[in-house]
């Protein structure tokens, strides 16, 4: 196994604008890190820099304690799995998996042993003589992973490998990737725009935005304690409710438009009188009663999802979404009385957007 270190790496195409701002990341031996963010945030560019397919403008990359910043891709000890399977259509599964080792001059016996072991791990034993056209999308992706596994790399790099699969296959392949990593324990860096993939696969998640690592943490950490408004709005489905307002002059309550006031769980006296953004996830809002101090919300629409429902309404000009139990189906125009637990409230600075 081998660790991976990015040390203040940057990328600029024109020498002026940095598409990757100075970024430092330490990936431990055997760790599975997922880089997630919207299109254009720099995650695939960063992955290609690690692979050696894009030059690093400044900073350094280390793999297995060796500086690889200027090394050719073939010398870095990495193997990539792409969104497109890139299999040779005229070759069998076995030949596709063996080809990279063959052109490196590895002996036939050793190649055969590695292909056999990778096929066993990926349950491709009975498909080795088939051509890619005879395989399903999931099987083709397994062959692409097998081609990477036989190289026995120090680091696996995954560039949105499940994007071409349908929803059912993506779920299946997520489970298979988890099992594969538990078995191989190879250091892995994985890129996706899909937060579900990020949360289910990662040991740690790096949320990227505009070439910046907004937050690096476990899936639980980025869900429970988002470091910024961007992370709060990106992680979670539906997204966290974000409500503009101000902390009252005593620092004890948060004041929203329309005269709605919510109690704060102490510790905010230093922010008294300041404009802030309050966040709460739809699943953390509970139904209450007017007599119990519930806050009213007139419901505009109801989304029935099956396992649960989403109620949509407004406080003034600000939208609010509440996740309801399956049996709760209020009608449009009805008033819901809500309880927002103090320990589930998040506050973000009104100017910087950072968590306070």
Curated annotation (Swiss-Prot):
Cellular compartment(s): Cell inner membrane
Family listed: Belongs to the ABC transporter superfamily. sn-glycerol-3-phosphate importer (TC 3.A.1.1.3) family.
PANTHER family: MALTODEXTRIN IMPORT ATP-BINDING PROTEIN MSMX, SN-GLYCEROL-3-PHOSPHATE IMPORT ATP-BINDING PROTEIN UGPC
Catalysed transformations (reactions): sn-glycerol 3-phosphate(out) + ATP + H2O = sn-glycerol 3-phosphate(in) + ADP + phosphate + H(+)
Organism listed in the record: Escherichia coli O6:H1 (strain CFT073 / ATCC 700928 / UPEC)
Boundaries of every ABC transporter domain copy: 4-235
GO CC entries: ATP-binding cassette (ABC) transporter complex, substrate-binding subunit-containing
Lipid bilayer topology: Peripheral membrane protein
Assembly: The complex is composed of two ATP-binding proteins (UgpC), two transmembrane proteins (UgpA and UgpE) and a solute-binding protein (UgpB).
Chief location category: membrane
Pfam family of the protein (one): OB_MalK
InterPro entries attached to this UniProt entry: AAA+_ATPase (IPR003593), ABC_transporter-like_ATP-bd (IPR003439), ABC_transporter-like_CS (IPR017871), ABC_transpr_MalK-like (IPR015855), ABC_transpr_MalK/UgpC-like (IPR047641), Mo/tungstate-bd_C_term_dom (IPR008995), NA-bd_OB-fold (IPR012340), OB_MalK-like (IPR040582)
Residues noted as binding ATP in the record, renumbered to the chain: 37-44
GO molecular function list: ABC-type glycerol-3-phosphate transporter activity; ATP binding; ATP hydrolysis activity
A GO BP annotation: glycerophosphodiester transmembrane transport
The enzyme's E.C. designation: 7.6.2.10
Keywords assigned: ATP-binding, Cell inner membrane, Cell membrane, Membrane, Nucleotide-binding, Sugar transport, Translocase, Transport
Protein name as it appears in the record: sn-glycerol-3-phosphate import ATP-binding protein UgpC
Function: Part of the ABC transporter complex UgpBAEC involved in sn-glycerol-3-phosphate (G3P) import. Responsible for energy coupling to the transport system.
